């Protein structure tokens, strides 16, 4: 692999001869290392020309993969003038012909003969080399503008690693069992191709190799056409850093973050490892260049092979922005909280139904969070793949343009700057016309064939991996669909349960309202106490009323007697008045006839008159007093009549209240008796359920006497109750059908205690009686169920009516 360009150095800079050494590594071929004495001797350049021939090196990876996802660890500055041309100074003294020590090829003779026939001289090779370098330089000039990516893309191998063998380990060591000879030959073949990739301003290595042109005809005319050969000289990173301050003013500056892949570490196994870096634009299968789509698939396969997704954390695998990573962490914390709630909720003392519902909700939340997280990861990987596809295509196009355009411009500037220098110099060193020997060409062909085989193997491996990934994707999609169906079914179940719970809650509320309206035992007791108190008050009032009536009758009798006395006195008064008038007439007559009356008669008449006056006065006084008493008695009679009317009204009200309370008491007593009866029946049914089998019971009953009075009485009671309940239900159903309000006592099963039982058949055998008893119990249960359904429906209707009102 042509991995480096060697820049000319001054002889007194780092070494006397100006030759600089490189460490052996996977980016350097063993045929061009100083340990094998394969470095070409460098020429000495004056100090004033040192900053003119060095060009800025873009910071990229050593792999030569157009800078996708990788970056160089050591920044190398571009040393060039404002014109951008290179000025080479030829050797001032006799320079020996440089020799490239090449290992002997073990390839077949047919391949070497074919290469000798195809390349008889070095001129054809040099022209093809210049075209390839030009193509590379143009592509890299275009790609240099779009390679400033400040996001760190970590742990992603470069595109050139597709040429690495399949049995490479994670440390980069090769496990293929080949001989050192074959590895060195492959390294030499790759060293040739690596030189074609590293020319131009966007070279992707730690150090550069600069071309030095020397005239191949020193003793001929200096004005003749220069047929140049390429010499290589190593220049270290310190030489490029020395003039970094003067060359930061270049218009195109590409910066990349450092990657550990750009700094290879030399190990014992890597000394004989073939270089892994080969530009994808120069790979070919059967002489035909590889298409960009195939190249992209090869690169993605290598990415997945070298750095699988399971081994990467969120920072290294996705290379996201900090705000996106924060969102993912928040989402994961949010998905972990339901699990904590689920594990912690078991310690709380909730009802079992509520715990089940909370568990379902937490499980649903956790599963939805995991599904969303996986969807986010899948979408992000798809976006990364599409983004990498686009960058690969763009960078390949730019690399091709740079390769086409860059080297032609550099070659023109080199020739223009070297021609006056060669005219002024007197001593020039002849160089051989042959650039690459036939053995090297055979090695290159062998390397090309091996790379083609590797490319085919990688294509097959890529197809297999793609098929596996498609199958895994289908499986994941099926799993997601099944999970979605499961989640939808769970949601439907939750909705049904919630609806059922709501219906039950409504039913409970209506029943609670209905039961709240019914009186309780305390209310019944308080009402009974009030009833007793009111009854006592009523008795007292009735007694008082009787006494007052008796007194009234006595007073009436007294009034009648007094009225009769008054009538008699009025009659007497009239008689007295008449007597007085008669006496006055007599007096007048006597006065007229006074002369004739004697004196004794006059005195007697005067005495009688005085007596009569006194009697009249006393009688008038008695009459006035009796009249006053009569008026007073009339007033008392009127007041007593008002009191009697009021007492009658109060007694009527009390009687009505007493009647209502008596009805309530009767209804409550009936309800209590019915409840007691029902509890007795349930206890009896439970006792019957706890008894042994029916056959044993029949055998026991057969041993009893035929006429078991207790069973007959119980049967009669049950049949009478069922008959009463059936009648009540029929009446309730008729009332509901007619649109009337049902009787609550019948609806609740409250009945009076004086319910007579009907007579039954004369067959009183124990077996028939037990069968009838079981049938009656079943009928009883059916009636209870019918009553509950009707009462629930009525309560629901009442609740709906209350809600609407």
From Swiss-Prot:
Record region (Disordered): 1-27, 50-89
Keywords associated with the record? Chromosomal rearrangement, Coiled coil, Cytoplasm, Cytoskeleton, Disease variant, Lissencephaly, Phosphoprotein
* UniProt-listed Pfam families: CC4_CEP85 (PF24555)
Bias (Polar residues) ranges: 60-74
Q: What is the annotated tissue distribution of the protein whose record heads this document?
A: Isoform 1 and isoform 4 are expressed in spleen, lymph, thymus, tonsil and peripheral blood leukocytes, with isoform 1 expressed at higher levels. Isoform 4 is detected in K-562 leukemia cells and in the blood of precursor T lymphoblastic lymphoma (T-ALL) patients.
Per UniProt, subcellular location reads as:
Cytoplasm, Cytoskeleton, Microtubule organizing center, Centrosome
Question: GO CC terms for this protein?
Answer: centrosome; cytoplasm; pericentriolar material
Main localization of the protein described in the UniProt heading: cytoplasm
Coiled-coil stretches: 439-682
Q: Which residues carry this modification: Phosphoserine?
A: 15, 207
Q: Is-annotated flag, keyword Coiled coil?
A: yes
- InterPro entries to which the protein is assigned, alphabetical: Cep85/Cep85L (IPR040210)
- GO BP terms, alphabetized: neuron migration
The entry's linked illness reads: A chromosomal aberration involving CEP85L is found in a patient with T-lymphoblastic lymphoma (T-ALL) and an associated myeloproliferative neoplasm (MPN) with eosinophilia. Translocation t(5;6)(q33-34;q23) with PDGFRB. The translocation fuses the 5'-end of CEP85L (isoform 4) to the 3'-end of PDGFRB. Lissencephaly 10: A form of lissencephaly, a disorder of cortical development characterized by agyria or pachygyria and disorganization of the clear neuronal lamination of normal six-layered cortex. LIS10 is an autosomal dominant form clinically characterized by variably delayed development, mildly to moderately impaired intellectual development, language delay, and seizures. Some patients have normal early development and borderline to mild cognitive impairment.
Q: What does this protein do?
A: Plays an essential role in neuronal cell migration.
- The protein's name is Centrosomal protein of 85 kDa-like
Which classification does the entry list for the species? Eukaryota, Metazoa, Chordata, Craniata, Vertebrata
């Amino acid at each position: 692999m042509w991995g480096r360009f060697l820049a000319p150095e001054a002889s007194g800079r780092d070494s006397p001869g100006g030759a600089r050494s490189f460490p052996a590594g996977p980016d350097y071929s063993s045929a061009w290392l100083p340990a094998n004495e394969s470095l070409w001797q460098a020429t000495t350049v004056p100090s004033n020309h040192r900053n003119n021939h060095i060009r800025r090196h873009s910071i990229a990876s050593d792999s030569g993969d157009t800078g996708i996802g990788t970056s160089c660890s050591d920044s190398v500055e571009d040393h060039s003038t404002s014109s951008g041309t290179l000025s080479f100074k030829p050797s001032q003294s006799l320079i020996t012909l440089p020799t490239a020590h090449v290992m002997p090829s073990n390839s077949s003779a047919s391949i070497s003969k074919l290469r000798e026939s195809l390349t008889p001289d070095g001129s054809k090779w040099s022209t093809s080399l210049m075209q390839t370098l030009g193509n590379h330089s143009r592509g890299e000039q275009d790609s240099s503008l779009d390679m400033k990516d400040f996001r760190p893309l970590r742990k992603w191998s470069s595109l050139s690693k597709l040429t690495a063998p399949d049995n490479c380990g994670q440390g980069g060591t090769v496990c293929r069992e080949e001989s050192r000879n074959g590895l060195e030959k492959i390294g030499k073949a790759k060293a040739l191709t690596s030189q074609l990739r590293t020319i131009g301003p966007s070279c992707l290595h730690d150090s550069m190799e600069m071309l030095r042109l020397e005239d191949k005809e020193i003793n001929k005319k200096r004005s003749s056409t220069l047929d140049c050969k390429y010499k290589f000289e190593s220049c270290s990173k310190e030489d490029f850093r020395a003039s970094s301050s003067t060359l930061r003013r270049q218009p195109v500056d590409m910066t990349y973050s450092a990657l550990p892949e750009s700094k290879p570490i030399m190990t014992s196994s890597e000394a004989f490892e073939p270089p892994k870096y080969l530009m994808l634009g120069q790979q070919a299968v059967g002489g035909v260049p590889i298409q960009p789509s195939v190249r992209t698939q090869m690169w993605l396969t290598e990415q997945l092979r070298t750095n699988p997704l399971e081994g990467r954390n969120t920072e290294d695998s996705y290379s996201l922005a900090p705000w996106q990573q924060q969102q993912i962490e928040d989402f994961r914390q949010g998905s972990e909280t339901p699990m904590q709630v689920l594990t912690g909720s078991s310690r709380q003392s909730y009802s079992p139904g509520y715990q089940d519902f909370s568990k379902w909700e937490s499980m649903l939340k956790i599963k939805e969070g995991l599904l969303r997280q996986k969807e986010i990861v899948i979408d992000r990987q798809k976006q990364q793949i599409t983004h990498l596809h686009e960058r690969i295509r763009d960078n390949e196009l730019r690399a091709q343009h740079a390769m086409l355009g860059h080297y032609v411009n550099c070659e023109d500037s080199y020739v223009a700057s070297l021609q006056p220098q060669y005219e002024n110099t007197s001593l020039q060193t002849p160089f051989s016309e042959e650039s690459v020997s036939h053995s090297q060409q055979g090695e290159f062909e062998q390397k090309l064939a091996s790379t083609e085989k590797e490319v085919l193997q990688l294509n097959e491996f890529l197809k297999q991996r793609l098929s596996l990934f498609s199958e895994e994707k289908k499986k994941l999609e099926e799993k997601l669909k099944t999970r979605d169906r499961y989640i939808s079914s769970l949601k439907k179940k939750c909705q049904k349960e919630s609806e059922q719970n709501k219906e039950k809650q409504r039913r409970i509320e209506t029943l609670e309202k209905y039961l709240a309206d019914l009186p309780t035992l305390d209310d019944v007791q308080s009402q009974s106490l009030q009833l007793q108190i009111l009854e006592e008050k009523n008795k007292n009032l009735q007694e008082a009323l009787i006494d007052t009536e008796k007194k009234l009758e006595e007073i009436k009798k007294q009034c009648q007697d007094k009225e009769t006395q008054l009538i008699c006195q009025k009659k007497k008064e009239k008689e007295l008045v008449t007597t007085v008038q008669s006496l006055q007439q007599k007096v007048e007559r006597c006065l007229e006839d006074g002369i004739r009356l004697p004196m004794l008669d006059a005195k007697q008449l005067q005495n009688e008159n005085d007596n009569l006056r006194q009697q009249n006065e006393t009688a008038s006084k008695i009459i006035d007093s009796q009249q006053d008493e009569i008026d007073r008695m009339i007033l008392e009679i009127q007041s007593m009549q008002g009191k009697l009317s009021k007492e009658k009204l109060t007694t009527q009200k009390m009687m009505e209240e007493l009647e209502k309370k008596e009805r309530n008491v009767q209804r409550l007593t009936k309800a209590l008796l019915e409840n007691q009866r029902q509890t007795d029946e349930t206890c009896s049914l439970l006792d019957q359920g706890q008894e042994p089998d029916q056959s044993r019971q029949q055998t026991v009953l057969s041993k009893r006497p035929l006429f078991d009075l207790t069973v007959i009485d119980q049967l009669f009671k049950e049949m009478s109750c069922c008959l009463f309940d059936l009648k009540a239900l029929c009446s309730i159903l008729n009332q509901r059908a007619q649109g009337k309000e049902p009787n609550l006592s019948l609806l609740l099963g409250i009945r009076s205690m004086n319910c007579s039982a009907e007579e039954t058949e004369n067959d009183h055998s124990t077996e028939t009686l037990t069968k009838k008893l079981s049938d009656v119990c079943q009928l009883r249960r059916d009636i209870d169920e019918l009553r509950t359904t009707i009462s629930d429906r009525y309560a629901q209707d009442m609740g709906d009516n209350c809600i609407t009102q």
